[in-house]
Amino acid sequence: MIAGGVGSVDARHQHKLPLPAGTLLVQLGGPGMRIGLGGGAASSMGVGSNAAELDFASVQRANPEMERRVQEVINACRAMGDNNPILSIHDVGAGGLSNAFPELAHDADKGADFDLSRIPVAESGMSPAEIWCNESQERYVLGIAPERLPELEALCTRERCPMAVVGTVTDAEHLKLAAPGEPPAVDIDMSVLFGKSPKLRREGATPARTELPGMDLSELNLDTLATQILQLPAVASKSFLITIADRTVGGLSVRDPMVGPWQVPVADCAVGLLDYRNHHGDALSMGERSPAAVQDSAAASRLAIAESLTNLLSAVPDDLGQTKLSANWMADAGSAGQDAALYAAVEAASRLCIELGISIPVGKDSLSMRARWKGDDGQRVKEIGRAHV
């Protein structure tokens, strides 16, 4: 299953503001734990080939209550409009604080000094690398002027949201992480982290196209064929994904997930309001053509984009240029023919979007889509290079 979402941002808050030297760097949210330390090492491996220690280290553990508290603080800051105390903000994802804080400073062409002892942790005995690199959820990093700190502290106290000032911005583009009285755990120039790394070169051979063999239809049973086709996830009803949960939360859903007088078919797209006072909103649709990718990944990529756009038509968009795509590229990278299939899918999507005048500003790659069991020489299931849009 693939899940996605859409959001909106006030035009006044869409650009990060400069971070002068002395700006406070704050961690907002819960403490760090030994979570996600498998990180990219685990996500780059096929299911079934991981070591138990790596599986445990890479697993994520969510805390919805903490996420809600953090979100309420951010919402309160956003509601201040031009008086928003947040100068710049990042969510903490892959790489943990070791990625989020340096990116925050680098975006402002600055450096930063961090006090390792100020970073909140929930487990004893964590090494500096574990504290700095763990991927615990429900955390954000932000820059705030020193004089605005009392306001942020008051908001966090009201919402019972943990926060900690863990560093300051410096003019020198240098990154330092140290605990008082201890040698620095990190002491490097920002250029080492953000310098131009060499591009990865991959070569993949395009396999020869094989024509589908002719089929003897005389022995096929129509009922059996219909049942098999209707069981295909790309064809079957998706209603079970809706009926297992609440249809709407918050009262801003305009288009009910199910349509028609008996509420049986699933709607082509989702439509939600931005607030309770106006009639502006967002529409969200999806497209995927997995069966077509078996024969032609480029065609499947174009079909997925076409499906997402035609599903969106029921919301009657004013202009196609208002549409933004998010593509999830999926493949079993490295296996025979899959690198070439993925390249063809990306190239086809790029050319089509250029012709249509739309862009794919965001997305995700899932390039270890394979599962194996009974060892490396046993059974294997793999993904075909394609795109979800």
Name what the model sees in each region:
Residues 1-386:
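Glycine/proline-enriched, intrinsically flexible loops and inter-domain linkers
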